[in-house]
């Protein structure tokens, strides 16, 4: 299965479910009236598109219907696709233009940080890049060992300290090692943290500061890993993390496991943070660049 087929298949469940619900709605109406728009708004919300974003979509759709004189609900679908595509904007990919590029990976436990790091490292090494992974989740038992397994599978290198050591020191050493060894990319793991754990959020600020200092002049990406199956809770996480970190992109995992997925639109619309990568399966090569066109 080729790259585009794989990502299309991975998000098929999400796309087909959303459009299936919309198609059912379109087929059940013979005219476009206020009842139609109310039903459409409810349908979008059920697909995990936030309330405000759903309202905005319907507002834009009302304008298009009026301006273009659309009478038949069946003609709405193309306009709906256009509005959503405009909300998602241009695809934004990770910037690998500098050497090293530093990627800080953050998020709560269980969202898929470790597997995302392993898959990303594997993808980059397969492209001929030299990758160093910083094992800066020093708080959780076995986190370093778990990451080591993924790094070995990916054919990358790891910089690690003992459990309980200072995470910022691990990041500092990893970036220093990358410079010394001529590595292309440094991927930094971090402890899974919740918004109400102030000490962990403070630690994240410290790590971010170290990254900026050590990687001055280099591309620095901060990727927030979110579990697509958690719906609106993922949006809340993104809002809270963005208060602490300068998030440059979202990694949306487990997208193959949800029939909703409107979360992508909501995050982009409400927070202005692009989804850069999506996890669409369990295999090591099931991490893809997000494509609004395929979505």
Predicted segments — roles?
Residues 111-118, 141-143, 233-235, 258-262:
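Short glycine/serine/threonine-rich phosphate/pyrophosphate-binding segments
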Residues 191-193:
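Short glycine-rich anion-binding loops that position phosphate/pyrophosphate groups of nucleotides
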Residues 1-8:
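Compositionally biased, charge-rich terminal segments
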Residues 13, 17-136, 143-188:
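Primarily NTPase-proximal linker/entry elements flanking Walker-type ATP/GTP-binding cores
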Residues 51-53, 140, 256, 284:
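Short hydrophobic/aromatic residue motifs in ordered secondary structure
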Residues 166-181, 195-293:
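Conserved catalytic-core segment of NTP-binding enzymes
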Residues 106-107, 189, 225, 279:
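Short beta-strand segments
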């Amino acid at each position: 299965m080729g790259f585009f087929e794989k990502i299309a298949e991975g998000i098929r469940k999400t796309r087909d479910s959303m459009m299936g619900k919309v198609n059912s709605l379109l087929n059940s109406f013979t005219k476009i009236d206020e009842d139609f728009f109310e039903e459409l708004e409810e349908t979008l919300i059920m697909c995990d598109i936030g309330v405000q974003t759903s309202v905005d979509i319907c507002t834009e759709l009302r304008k298009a219907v009026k301006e273009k004189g659309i009478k038949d609900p069946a003609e709405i679908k193309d306009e709906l696709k256009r509005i959503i595509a405009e909300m998602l904007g241009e695809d934004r990919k990770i910037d690998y233009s500098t050497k090293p590029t530093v990627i800080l990976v953050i998020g709560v436990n269980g969202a898929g940080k470790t597997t995302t790091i392993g898959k990303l490292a594997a993808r980059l090494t397969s492209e001929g890049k030299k990758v160093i992974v910083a094992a800066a989740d020093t708080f959780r038992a076995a986190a370093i060992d778990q990451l080591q397994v993924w790094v070995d599978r990916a054919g990358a290198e790891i910089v690690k300290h003992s459990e309980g050591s200072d995470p910022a020191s691990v990041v500092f050493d990893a970036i220093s090692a990358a410079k010394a060894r001529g590595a292309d990319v440094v991927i930094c793991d971090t402890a899974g943290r919740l918004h109400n754990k102030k000490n962990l959020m403070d630690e994240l600020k410290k790590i971010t500061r170290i990254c900026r200092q050590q990687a001055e002049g280099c591309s620095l990406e901060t990727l927030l890993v979110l579990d697509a199956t958690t719906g609106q809770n993922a949006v809340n996480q993104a809002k809270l993390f963005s208060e602490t970190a300068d998030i440059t992109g979202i990694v949306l995992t487990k997208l193959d496991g949800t029939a909703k997925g409107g979360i992508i639109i909501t995050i982009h619309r409400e927070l202005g943070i692009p989804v850069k990568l999506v996890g669409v399966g369990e295999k090591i090569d099931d991490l893809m660049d997000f494509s609004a066109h395929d979505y």
